[in-house]
């Protein structure tokens, strides 16, 4: 199981996405609702106060696409 979607991109979600991509080599989709503060910060800067997202992580606000692409949804 290599394609994982993490629903939510706040503190925990961004860390889980980062960990799975950088430490476990998984293909990760990180979903957040458009307009949400955490999503907008990650979209605009690629990082928050805790982690810098790996470039391999796909950040999206399209919930259907995030779920359809994944083998596992967290």
How should each PLM-predicted stretch be described?
Residues 70-71:
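An anion/phosphate-binding loop that grips the pyrophosphate of nucleotide cofactors and donors
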